[in-house]
């Protein structure tokens, strides 16, 4: 049955290898079980329900990817967009979390339609690669600022906007320790480095009496506080257009990059560089994002951590199915997730931020018409506390720099149209 469903022999793999790969992938991305409730919980959402929604969204998404596309790629609520959901859409812009979930659903529906009608290729190819790298780096810097704030390492300062936190308190010190530990474990190629870092810091905090111990295993909490609580009509407000756009474009670029990157490592690319069943994979991803918003979590997306499972030998969707099963098993570990303090998840955020900024190394810094938009894009996200603003500033700056330099041939209609729309949005409809 498994052979017929996943074509194991054709992919030169077996059940044992796929199970090992699935466990490896799960361990490298299981940190989301602790981080996602911590971030989304700041909106006022029930953390227990978020934990269940995170587990179910990851399980459903990974299963869909395995069954529909037969790829060894796992899904879960994405880092970056969960922070954008909480800190920008809800806390900064003042929308309710129900409206934010509605925006996630709408963006996922648009993603689904783009995947079905194959418009995705046109959109992705219209956006210059340096700008895509800048968007990823900007999200990384956005996450870094949030991580430092949650760790207590960066605090408000009326004179200088921000300042250094109290390094004599245990929270910031443990956060620094956690970050160093994660980096060291990752450098030594230890599987599950991020999750180990979170758990070690939590254990030390419990031992010092800084954090109360809430237990490890119990029956799953109720999903009722977030299930089907999204407000789609509220998300159709004109002030939410840029938010929906940000959710859509970041998910689109992130998924495309992840799918291609992991597929290359798995040897799934065709000789002409084409990724077979890309459409199926994106349909699975968008369907998972829609399902996640119904359950009560931010955008569900493909995880680059799937590459660790590929390195362990994963080649088919059976790897993703194993990950799905482990996320369902994780439903019974809600008390452990509730015990983890913010300063223990902050190192994970900071580490992910480091990974996301790596794309800046590929930028042609000698071309000022490329370097300027990239820097503006990356800086605008943390400094305006908005991924949407960063994307808007990036598009506008890229178009302006190229046009004013007389390099019109490096522009395309989609880029120009989007830049004009962003100018209109920022000038007349900025929320």
Regions found by a protein language model. Give the residues of each.
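Helix-loop-helix hairpins and the membrane-proximal interhelical loops
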Residues: 1-49, 162-165, 195-279, 420-424
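Membrane-embedded alpha-helical modules
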Residues: 93-207, 321-431
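Helix-coil boundary and interhelical linker segments in multi-pass alpha-helical membrane proteins
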Residues: 38-50, 88-99, 238-241, 341, ...
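Loop-to-helix transition at the N-terminal end of transmembrane alpha-helices
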Residues: 44-63
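Juxtamembrane transmembrane-helix boundary signature
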Residues: 58-79, 110
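Helix-loop-helix junctions within the multi-pass membrane cores of secondary transporters/permeases
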Residues: 2-36, 57, 78-136, 264-360
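Hydrophobic/aromatic residues within the transmembrane alpha-helices of Major Facilitator Superfamily
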Residues: 23-30, 60-63, 67, 148, ...
């Amino acid at each position: 049955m498994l052979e017929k469903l996943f074509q194991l022999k054709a992919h030169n793999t077996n059940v044992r290898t796929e199970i090992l790969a699935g466990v490896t992938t799960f361990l490298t991305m299981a940190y989301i079980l602790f981080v996602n409730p911590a971030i989304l919980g700041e909106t006022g959402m029930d953390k227990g329900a978020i934990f269940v929604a995170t587990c179910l969204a990851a399980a459903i998404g990974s299963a869909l990817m395995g069954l529909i596309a037969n790829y060894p790629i796992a899904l879960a609520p994405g880092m970056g967009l969960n922070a954008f959901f909480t800190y920008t859409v809800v806390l900064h812009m003042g929308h309710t979390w129900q409206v934010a979930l509605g925006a996630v659903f709408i963006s996922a529906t648009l993603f689904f339609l783009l995947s079905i009608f194959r418009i995705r290729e046109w959109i992705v190819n219209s956006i210059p690669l340096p700008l895509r790298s800048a968007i990823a780096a900007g999200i990384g810097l956005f996450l870094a600022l949030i991580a430092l704030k949650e760790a207590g390492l960066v605090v408000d300062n009326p004179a200088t906007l921000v300042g250094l936190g109290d390094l004599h308190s245990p929270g910031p010190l443990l956060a620094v320790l956690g970050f160093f530990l994660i980096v060291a474990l990752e450098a030594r190629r230890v599987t599950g480095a991020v999750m180990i870092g979170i758990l070690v810091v939590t254990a030390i905090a419990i031992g010092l009496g800084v954090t109360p111990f809430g237990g490890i295993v119990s029956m799953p909490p109720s999903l009722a506080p977030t299930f089907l609580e999204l407000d789609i009509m509220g998300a159709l407000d004109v002030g939410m257009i840029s938010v929906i756009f940000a959710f859509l474009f970041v998910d689109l670029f992130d998924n495309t990059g992840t799918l291609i990157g992991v597929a290359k490592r798995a040897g799934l690319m065709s000789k002409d560089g084409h990724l077979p069943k890309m459409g199926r994979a994106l349909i699975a991803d968008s369907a998972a994002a829609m399902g996640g918003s119904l359950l009560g979590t931010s955008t569900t997306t493909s995880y680059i951590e799937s590459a660790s499972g590929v390195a362990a030998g994963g080649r088919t969707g059976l790897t993703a199915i194993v990950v799905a099963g482990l996320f369902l098993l994780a439903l019974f570990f809600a008390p452990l997730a509730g015990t983890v303090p913010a300063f223990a998840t902050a190192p994970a955020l900071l580490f992910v931020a480091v990974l996301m900024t790596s794309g800046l190394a590929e930028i042609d810094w000698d071309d000022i018409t490329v370097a300027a938009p990239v820097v503006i894009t990356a800086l605008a996200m943390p400094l305006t506390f908005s991924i949407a603003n960063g994307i808007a500033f990036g598009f506008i700056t890229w178009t302006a720099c190229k046009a004013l330099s007389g390099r019109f041939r490096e522009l395309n209609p989609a880029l120009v149209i989007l830049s004009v729309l962003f100018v209109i949005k920022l000038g007349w409809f900025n929320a």
